[in-house]
Amino acid sequence: VPKTTRHHKNFQQGYLVQLKQVLKMKDLNRLHVSVFALHLLLTAMFIYVPSQLINFAEIPLASHGWVYLPLLVISLFFAFPSIILAEKYRKMRGIFLTAIGGIIAGLLVMIFGFESKYILLLGLGLFFIAFNVMEALLPSWLSKAAPIQSKATAMGVNASGQFLGAFCGGILGGQLLILNDTAMGWSILTAIAIVWLLISFGLSQP
């Protein structure tokens, strides 16, 4: 009976090599920061916005679903053409940066017009449109930027950034409620989005 040679692959070592490779790629790191910032802002908003709708828009908590649903549907009508434009005409970087700008614009509207019901809703609408564009673009860009042999590792790091962003957003949203200063609260969220935009300017067209 011929002897067979068995080769044992060190999967842990291979994973660590891939992880180091992924963490050294600047564009991937910017995408990880993006998913972190996006879900931080979203979670903070969902904690912070209900009090704003009650206090300034005079919309009872039980009716908030009827605010979010139309805004979500409207935002999808804007999101789909943006995604097609980004993929078909290779405008992903421009639309990506524009979407972050849309998030900033929505937050700025809420800084200066939070006392008006309709301006507050306009700001929320801008935010949700930009959010849905970003939510669709990020996975697509990640799959293009990640090396073939390290795609799973890159997606794992990105998913960790998403959950960490939601965790930090929950903490931030709670702190904004405790702060009890509406203009300052929106300003803090806007500042985070501006830092995110500045970091994202370094992204290359995929």
Model-derived features: positions:
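Juxtamembrane intracellular "pre-TM" segments in multi-pass secondary transporters
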Residues: P2-S34
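Helix-to-loop junctions at the C-terminal end of transmembrane segments
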Residues: F78-K91, L177
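A membrane-interface helix-boundary motif in multi-pass transporters
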Residues: Q175-A193
